[in-house]
Amino acid sequence: MGKEISRIRLNRLYSESNIFEEISFHDGVNIILGEKYDDSSVKGRKTNGVGKSMSIEFLDFGFLNDYEKSRIAKIPKEVFPLEENVILDLDIGDEAITIKRNRKQADQPVIIREGRTVSFDKLQDAREYLTGLIFPKLNGKKVPSFRNLFSILMRDERSEFTDIIKCHDLTKKIPDDLSAHLFL
């Protein structure tokens, strides 16, 4: 099965003008933890408001989520300019991939594959392109989308982490989909 699905390795997430702090990923499982900001006591230090959820939102934006449903859409343009590119560097199989996306043209991402730039007019076309890279030998067969795969690994905090199958916002009535679980 490992030969039918290309390995995905995240390398780094950043913005073109360094508006947010770059996140570098390491091989294996990566956990985003907040740095404790209350140094007055060792016990009970607070990690609220240090950017854990927004880091996940930026990562999800890089993975081509629906911009309108994202918390990134709510950031004032004075804080995060609409033209600022969010850049995600990753490897799919043996190929270096860079995904560039900004809020002004959120539905028109750019994917750089081994130095060659591919621009998309529709978000869905870019998603299908990435799905084809992840499942190169399963073309034409029913496979989960790469967005489906990542919903398991990068869970929405509104899923309440209570059910391994329900990895989406529990306030939405989304039917259970086991396909991504079966591929992992």
Feature map (PLM): residue ranges:
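Extended, Lys/Glu-rich alpha-helical coiled-coil stalks
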Residues: K141-L184
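Gly/Lys-enriched N-terminal cap/neck module of very large, oligomeric protein machines
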Residues: I87-R113
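Alpha-helical scaffold elements adjacent to nucleotide-binding pockets in ATP/GTP-utilizing enzyme cores
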Residues: S55-F58, K100, D125, Y129, ...
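Extreme N-terminal "head/tail" segments of very large remodeling/mechanoenzyme assemblies
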Residues: M1-E95
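A general boundary/transition motif marking the beginning of the first structured unit of a protein
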Residues: T47, V118, L138, H168-L170
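Short, charged, low-complexity patches
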Residues: N48-I56, S119, L123, I174
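Glycine-rich phosphate-binding loops of NTPases
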Residues: K104-S159
